[in-house]
Amino acid sequence: ISSVRLDFAGDLSRDEGERPARLAALREAWGLPVGQPFRQADWDAATQRVLDALSAREYAAAAITDSEALIDPATASAALSVTVDSGPVFRFGPLEITGLVDYDRSLIERYRPPTPGEPYSQERLLLFQNALQNTTYFASVVVDIDRHSATPEAAPVRVQVTEAKPRRVGFGFGVSSNPGYRVEPSYRDAHFFDRAYNLVSGLRIEQRRQLVYADVFLPPSLDGALDSVGVLAEHTNIAGLQTQRQSIGVVRTLPSGNIENRFALNYQHEAL
């Protein structure tokens, strides 16, 4: 490689704020310096890395408007030039949600969507998408923005969901040396009482132990708190000793960064 020319146009080319430092970082990260052997695969990867680094934050519509690798067989050299147009600065706008049937849009709003006016970030969109995808409510989730929006300062956040089947019935069977046989039917309802409450319930019947349980998990509150309530009843008959146990409890989980604080209140009654 005999020479490299890396030009930028659009908002990023303005000599204001943090733009010069970001431009310098992009030039520093360029992966094909002068003197390095030229390979087409490396050239393609280097231009894509520049575009990805730029479009990942603020400049969602960034595009390569010109790229050229002039090969001189006589001198066995390559002169490289790339022009990248950052486009305008993008900020998140209102949610545009499609695909909801059973659930209300307020359910999606509980999973911390980007705030209108917040600078665009691909990582922020992925965090929001993963939060929705990891629930029991949706079979698939796609979150993106309108990169051709006429209002990049308030680009709509498009949320496309496919709802999962809310109700599921399961059945398990097993045999082991200690409790003997085991039969366990279960029932789950992610739209319990038509309120997006997630019911997880089951009946476990073993040769020496019987258990019935039900837990209800509420969707997160607007501040991220997770609440749940559960009940359980158990009967055992081991070596002629019969026991009865009933339990009811409530749990609140409060996220704080990477730490979860869990507060629980439980009442339990046991009898022989």
For the regions a language model picked out, list residue spans one by one:
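Interaction-mediating elements
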Residues: 1-157, 164-166, 180-182
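Gram-negative/organellar outer-membrane beta-barrel architecture
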Residues: 13-25, 118-272
